[in-house]
Amino acid sequence: MVSALREAPLIRVHSSPVSSPSVSGSRRPVSCLSSQSSALSQSGGGSTSAAGIEARSRALRRRWCPAGIILLALISLLSCLLPASEAKVYGRCELARVLHDFGLDGYRGYSLADWVCLAYFTSGFNTAAVDHEADGSTNNGIFQINSRRWCRNLTPNVPNVCQMYCS
């Protein structure tokens, strides 16, 4: 059993060992990081005592597992994509098509080019754009509608003419 421990790399992920069957059918601890135990045992060095094995185990628990790093990176990437799915940044022609479909071409005397120009210079065609004013109100969305009068933004006692939330 001691010789099997010398030859097999003893590695733990977090603090629980993961076992896999070896060639002889017994189970041995395995992980994604290898220790130097096989190199030490071949050169005659290394400790086979329980204290030596425990010291090596503690040292290995402090290291990051590459699989763990990959999982962390994947979770981070996915969490970055979630909020982005709620907002949209339009292209110039795409926004012009949408505004035309909603009948804004010629609305109140303003051409489609005027609406597209307004959207570009106020929000950069970004539907999630929010600008905070000095008085505590916010300008929201692609046309930067102000929360002081037109929509409700968690501030009590505002007119809320459109009867809707700014978000």
Curated annotation (Swiss-Prot):
Give the positions of the site Cleavage: 87-88
Q: Which Pfam families does the record match to this protein?
A: Lys
InterPro entries found in the cross-reference section: Glyco_hydro_22, Glyco_hydro_22_lys, Lysozyme-like_dom_sf
- Post-translational note: The processed form derives from the membrane form by proteolytic processing.
Alphabetical list of PROSITE patterns matching this protein: GLYCOSYL_HYDROL_F22_2
Q: On the Cytoplasmic side, which residues? A: 1-63
Disulfide bridge map: 151-166
> What is a single cellular component term in the Gene Ontology annotation?
acrosomal membrane
Q: Which domain of life is it from?
A: Eukaryota
Q: What membrane topology is given? A: Single-pass type II membrane protein
Where does this protein chiefly localize?
A: membrane
Q: Which CDD domains match?
A: LYZ_C (cd16897)
**GO terms, biological process:** fusion of sperm to egg plasma membrane involved in single fertilization
Domain C-type lysozyme per the UniProt entry, residue ranges: 88-167
Name the job this protein performs: Sperm surface membrane protein that may be involved in sperm-egg plasma membrane adhesion and fusion during fertilization. It could be a potential receptor for the egg oligosaccharide residue N-acetylglucosamine, which is present in the extracellular matrix over the egg plasma membrane. The processed form has no detectable bacteriolytic activity in vitro.
Similarity annotation: Belongs to the glycosyl hydrolase 22 family.
What binding partners and quaternary form does the record give? Interacts with ASTL.
Q: What is this protein called?
A: Sperm acrosome membrane-associated protein 3
* Organism listed in the record: Pongo pygmaeus (Bornean orangutan)
